[in-house]
């Protein structure tokens, strides 16, 4: 149960933060956000803000989404003959079109729709008591959809397609950008919880109380300057020295040179065997000043992003489904993190957020990266691609993503449960 809750919480936070990036910059770019939803499925709460956005909470706590006017297939479709009820404003214009069948307004006018245009000419036409009538529709009118969600109509001037090229580009980039920001913030929280940021650039290490070095009397304040014949100047050189000195050896002993108060001495240590790796019982030192901790959030996030990019590069040149993880693998990892405490959950949250940010920047049309490529092409050509071409390109991207997701999920299930 804890694993399920952790998965829902981590995935939910990441998706909502991602979608909020699209939401915020869409509004700044003059694009109408028709709905900002937390969760999926049937709605359990809805509120229309003064900004015209419907804020909804939906029953399945799995992420969320934004509906931008003119983005994708977000259009209002009314079939000929559909019964609706119209609420009129004082000036005679329609301010609400109710498609839900529920009675929301005692004075609403029933109509069977024969024609409508909510994008350009803003009118609705149909039969009212067997008489055909046409009504002008207010620019900020709302539509009550079949499930009861009330959203603004989407006239052309507030649609995604009519934003500036830079407005569209930043709107598409903002989702992944928020994922990177979330990663940095969570790493900050971790660093402050741990009392500082790891200092891997010095040979002043933290000697663990029950470790191999502590058992031979090495004090916490000592510096490790040499292991065997290998100089030690930082954390990486210590790791390499231990691995080199213990390679192909059983129960090895190490000659460790330490420096304390200006004098050097050598101690002989028997490292602890941990599943084939030999440990001295040391950790990197910690920088606890505010500036180091602040910068540490950025550097830790950057290091994580570089590792993910390196793994992605290897995957491109050496494709292997076993190197990919879908929802099942993420659930398994979240369950493992939940068993090991809040710090592991936070680390998992930061890493997955950065991972999703990078993944979304891959130039596949269905992803934000693909949309950004289309924005760049539009900027170069000084005109957008034809809507039909953009639709087909996006559809191809969706097909690729669906096939990949099915393959990865199937591979996850087979790998985790049947091997």
Swiss-Prot record:
The keyword Secreted does not apply. GO terms for molecular function: metal ion binding; metalloendopeptidase activity. The chain crosses the membrane at residues 169-191, 345-367, 388-410. CDD domains: S2P-M50_PDZ_RseP-like. GO terms for cellular component: plasma membrane. Belongs to the peptidase M50B family. This is Putative zinc metalloprotease spr0242. It comes from Streptococcus pneumoniae (strain ATCC BAA-255 / R6). The lineage of its organism: Bacteria, Bacillati, Bacillota, Bacilli, Lactobacillales.
